[in-house]
Design a protein with these regions (language model features):
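Short loop/turn microsegments at loop-to-beta-strand junctions
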Residues: 74-75, 97, 196-197
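Hydrophobic beta-strand positions
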Residues: 78-79, 201
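Hydrophobic beta-strand anchors of alpha/beta hydrolase catalytic cores
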Residues: 98-99, 134, 199
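Periplasmic c-type cytochrome electron-transfer domains
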Residues: 49-56, 147, 162-170, 195-198
Length: 231
């Protein structure tokens, strides 16, 4: 177990000024509460996939994931990856983008998300996978070192296929706020992070179109990614 550290001083919870994307996530939180799921996951927790038939912010569609309603442009996202290269979400226009928020010390939810995204890319085949970009944003500015990230990506089969973005607590905190993501160090086990466990499906035109809980299946991504890329 890592030596306990003090939580970061920067705000780690979204505020009422979080912007357009925050309304998407807050709508989803209401839905998930209604159906008995959990949108804010602890590092050892889990979540049920929100029903796509619920209409309070999520609508039925041809997608297997939950369709955001109304769909909104993806908020800004520009950080360095663990290799020090600047990555901007806008550079992937024309591709489906699957965006999630992870950390390398996570004992269960994050490995599950990363591994299932890797399986989905494998099952798509090279042609379809080339039209998909997976992005993870760190929720652990202290623990997600370049060495830790490289090992995590290799361990879960997404090395070279997932852009893992890192930064200072201040840099990451701004992104969490913009995307309406909850992230905070656990009070009793500060090496763990309580965080939102969603995957955002973003269309080729840069629109946040679908949402997936941590319990998504690779088959859902295999089905939805080509639709996202072409929409």
């Amino acid at each position: 177990m890592s030596t306990p550290e003090s939580p970061p001083t920067e705000p780690t919870q979204p505020s009422s000024g979080g912007g357009l994307s925050l309304r998407i996530v807050l709508s989803l939180v209401v839905i998930v509460v209604i159906v008995g799921g959990v949108a804010l996951l602890t590092s050892g927790g889990g979540s049920n996939r929100p029903s796509s038939s619920i209409v309070h912010g999520v609508a039925s569609s041809e997608y297997r994931g939950s369709l955001t309603s109304p769909a909104q442009p993806a908020p800004p996202l520009s950080l360095h990856n663990y290799k020090g290269e600047r990555v901007n979400i806008d550079q992937y226009k024309g591709k489906a983008v699957l965006l999630t928020f992870l950390y390398t010390k996570c004992p269960d939810v994050c490995p599950l998300i990363a591994a299932n995204l890797g399986v989905a890319l494998n099952e798509m085949g090279p042609a379809k996978a080339s039209k998909v970009q997976v992005i993870a944003v760190s929720v652990d500015p202290r623990g997600d070192t370049p060495t830790a990230v490289a090992a995590f990506l290799k361990r879960h089969g997404v090395a070279g296929r997932m852009q893992y973005l890192v930064g200072s607590a201040h840099e990451l905190g701004r992104v969490w706020k913009t995307w309406g993501v909850g992230a905070e160090y656990d009070a009793e086990q500060p090496q763990l992070v309580n965080h939102s466990g969603l995957v955002y499906g973003i269309s080729g035109k840069g629109i946040v179109t679908t949402l997936y809980a941590a319990s998504f299946t690779p088959a859902e991504i295999v089905h939805d990614a080509p639709l996202l890329a072409s929409s």
